[in-house]
A protein has these predicted regions:
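Membrane-proximal alpha-helical anchors
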Residues: 2-111, 121, 192-198
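An amphipathic alpha-helical interaction surface
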Residues: 1-9, 89-198
Length: 198
């Protein structure tokens, strides 16, 4: 007995339509996957940047840890990542003061008598998270009392400007006259004669 099973011819549009729908679905899933991957990558970049974010701060005081009269000018990193200091300036009335003698002469009438100070250069240093650096210490003892008293008032008129970067080369500019550091594309070059050298 010879039995043939009749085969129904497939409609010309039915097979193609399902192929198109399957292809469109696959493309849609691929686009969603790509979008999720890009979004995840951006989130990872932001998390990495936040995990190495430095935050430079400037401060000044007039008491040493032992209670003695010592004027200090300090810069510290209160962020979570290291701060690479690219430039650092101290200005008084808009003029750079590259060292303690220059600053004390400009602000406080330091004459030919030497001032007894402890200073430190800042540019080119790396401050780890939580680290603080005193770049100028002026003890009252061994210094002219009139110069010390005047500097104790005028230290608030000294302006500190610095540019620093994270390990990912994101950079900020600190200006002691502004509330917080501002992001910059890169740190500008500052002439050596205008950099704080201590």
């Amino acid at each position: 007995m010879n039995t043939e099973i009749p085969v129904q011819p497939r409609g010309a549009t039915g097979g193609r339509l399902s192929n198109y729908l399957a292809s469109a679905f696959a493309i849609g899933v691929s686009m969603i996957s790509l979008s999720v991957a890009i979004s995840s990558n951006r989130t990872q970049e932001r998390l990495l940047a936040a995990s190495v974010w430095p935050a430079l701060e400037y401060g000044t005081g007039n008491r040493g840890a032992d209670g003695s009269d010592v004027i200090s000018m300090n810069v510290g990193n209160s962020g979570v990542g290291p701060a690479r200091l690219r430039s650092f300036q101290v200005l008084y009335q808009g003029r750079p003061a590259p060292n303690a003698a220059s600053l004390l002469t400009q602000c406080c009438g330091l004459a030919d008598a030497p001032a007894y100070t402890v200073t430190s250069g800042v540019s080119g240093r790396v401050l780890k998270a939580g680290e603080e650096l005193s770049f100028l210490l002026l003890p009252r003892e061994k210094n002219d009392a009139a110069v010390w008293d005047r500097f104790n008032r005028e230290r608030f008129n000294a302006r500190v400007q610095a540019c620093y970067c994270s390990v990912l080369d994101a950079c900020w500019r600190l200006d002691s006259e502004l509330a917080e550091p501002e992001p910059v594309a890169s740190c500008p070059d500052v002439p050596d004669a205008q950099e704080w050298s201590g």
